[in-house]
Amino acid sequence: YFYPLYLSSFLFWNKKLDRPLVLTSRVKRFLGILIGVTFIMIALTLSSKNSTNIFIFAPLILTYAISTAMEKIFFISFKHKAKQRYQSINNLKTVAITASFGKTSIKNYLYHVLKNKYKTYKTPRSVNTIAGIVLDVNKDLPLDTQIYIAEAGARVQGDIEEIAMFLEPEICVIGSVGEQHIEYFKTLDNIIHTKMELLKSPKMKKGFVHESVPIKDYPTITKYPNNLHIVKSNLDGIWFDVEIDGKIEHFHAPILGNFNAINLTAVILVSHYLGMSIEEIQKALQTLPQVEHRLQKIEAGGKIIIDDSFNGNLEGMLEAVNICSTYTGRKVIITPGLVESTDEANILLAKQINENFDFVILTGSLNTHLFSSNIDKEKVYILKDKSLMETTLARTTKVGDLILFANDAPNFI
């Protein structure tokens, strides 16, 4: 009776999600093996007069063992095929980017600038694992690519080194490093050492490293932001100056957030290193598109919506709060707080929200107690069912309001 009960519970849970579960090929293979092993076990059990419930979990255990072995064999083959295809591309230059936060933004911004001069390709969406990169190289990397921009993420030490050894990037970018994913690495030192694995690339010629990373001075390493000066930052964009080759250069981009000036400093330095002129870079930044769900400004129904739902770090969320504070009208925020962080960070965030927002909608129950204790009670509304978010916003907001979606989380959080 265990498996019918488990399956029913799974289907009920999946139906309640605002984003239903997608079954990948790997999951389908796993389920196929599980069903096969289960039927074999049932047949053996029914044919035996002395059957017991002692082996009730045997199908799961056997399926896991068989599936793990199969997937490892498949992956070794896929990886070898991807390496051959990757090495067959003549004169390819690869830029690999890692950071605790901001790596996807840097990748997207760099792609927008470089594509104006070179045949450029980037890993899609937030793909940043060795498995995702191998799949991308095998299926989608064009053979006429001149510059390949890849994002490198990690859950354990060694993940980024594996990516570095596979891609062997000539240019390595290490962005801001902080306590994001501290639950995986336990200490900030472990996070820093893991990010620095990118510099082990056998073919690295140049590295651009954020000043938050404690690294010695090397001829091949440039630390950034170098004499960055933010002139102005508001809901219309950012204006900033950067020192390049001993000269102060002026830049403007129609995206939001002081931290994006830091991300763009890395983009400017890499683009200039790869042969683009300052004028070409300045022109490209003028048309820089907003990154979806990362301080994306949308105007609809007489309201200003700031979609920052993919931003889950303290610095980024504080910056979103700071930008919204420049708005003179009524301000509303929808957030679950910080999901992968400390109580201290959530308390700091809650206090800043309390100072700058008129109404706070808390989604989920993860940080409800912390936020309710640090935000004026009359401002707080706890939304337990996210499917009611649209009707709640229609009821609690009006024309002229600014609405910030900050680190929105799925129901199961």
Regions inferred by a protein language model and the residue ranges of each:
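Acidic-glycine-rich active-site phosphate/pyrophosphate-binding loop
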Residues: 104-108, 232-248
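Short glycine/threonine-rich catalytic loop with a Thr-x-Gly-x-Asp
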Residues: 235, 255-266, 292-294, 313, ...
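Phosphate-binding loop of NTP-binding sites
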Residues: 1-211, 215-217, 268, 272-274
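A conserved, hydrophobic alpha-helical segment in the catalytic core
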Residues: 166-179, 214-217, 251-290, 318, ...
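Short, polar loop motifs at secondary-structure junctions
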Residues: 209-215, 226, 364-368, 410
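ATP-dependent carboxylate-amine ligase
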Residues: 1-72, 203, 272-279, 283-305, ...
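Beta-strand->loop->alpha-helix junctions that form or flank phosphate-binding loops
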Residues: 211, 217-235, 253-258, 282-287, ...
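Glycine/Thr-rich phosphate-binding loops of Rossmann-like dinucleotide-binding domains
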Residues: 158, 182-183, 217, 230, ...
